[in-house]
Swiss-Prot record:
The gene is EPO. GO terms for cellular component: cell surface; extracellular space. Residues 1-27 form the signal peptide. Produced by kidney or liver of adult mammals and by liver of fetal or neonatal mammals. The keyword Ligase does not apply. Keywords: Disulfide bond, Erythrocyte maturation, Glycoprotein, Hormone, Secreted, Signal. One of its GO terms (biological process) is negative regulation of calcium ion transport into cytosol. It comes from Ovis aries. This is Erythropoietin. The lineage of its organism: Eukaryota, Metazoa, Chordata, Craniata, Vertebrata. It is found in: Secreted. GO terms for molecular function: cytokine activity; erythropoietin receptor binding; hormone activity; protein kinase activator activity.
Length: 194
């Protein structure tokens, strides 16, 4: 195996090492998110965080409510949605979820006795959301999310609600990744393979 044969493998390995840091990876393959193992890794981290906070009472409640996206998916309606509308819903949900995780991180930092394990899960979620945002940009999802000027404003506003505990926030994070994000990336990757 020559040096040229190793270049793609080294770029892929480097991108996996830089993703947990939340750093943009310039040499990353643009369709890396189409590899199901990549998204599964983030889903697993979200589920671990959700499970770690399920039995947590002390230190897991927020002093204020945090706004999060509704993660329920009407599959019948989703399949009939325009690609731009799906992309817009995913981008809006990802942005709101990022704000919620950042707010949870700030509230946890200001807690009287913050648990180091909880802080680690929140930090991983922050890093994961940054990486997912970069991966979706590489997929071109951000371009699809921009509504066309002649498009009818039929897109419904993003449905939201509030949570008051870290366990609920991580449940929303996990559900969003397993639901809307997985549906959107799966379809976007299939469209790109045609």
């Amino acid at each position: 195996m020559g040096a040229r044969d190793c270049t793609p493998l080294l770029l892929l390995l480097l991108s996996f090492l830089l993703f947990p840091l939340g750093l943009p990876v310039l040499g990353a393959p643009p369709r890396l998110i189409c590899d199901s193992r990549v998204l599964e890794r983030y889903i697993l981290e979200a589920r671990e965080a959700e499970n770690a906070t399920m039995g947590c009472a002390e230190g897991c409640s927020f002093s204020e409510n945090i706004t999060v996206p509704d993660t329920k998916v009407n599959f019948y309606a989703w399949k009939r949605m325009e690609v731009q509308q799906q992309a817009l819903e995913v981008w809006q949900g990802l942005a709101l979820l990022s704000e919620a995780i950042f707010r949870g991180q700030a509230l946890l930092a200001n807690a009287s006795q913050p648990c180091e394990a909880l802080r680690l899960h929140v930090d991983k979620a922050v890093s994961g959301l940054r990486s997912l945002t970069s991966l979706l940009r590489a997929l071109g999802a951000q371009k699809e999310a921009i509504p066309l000027p002649d498009a009818t404003p039929s897109a419904a506003p993003l449905r939201i609600f509030t949570v008051d505990a870290l366990s609920k926030l991580f449940r929303i994070y996990s559900n969003f990744l397993r639901g809307k994000l997985t549906l959107y990336t799966g379809e976007a990757c299939r469209r790109g393979d045609r």
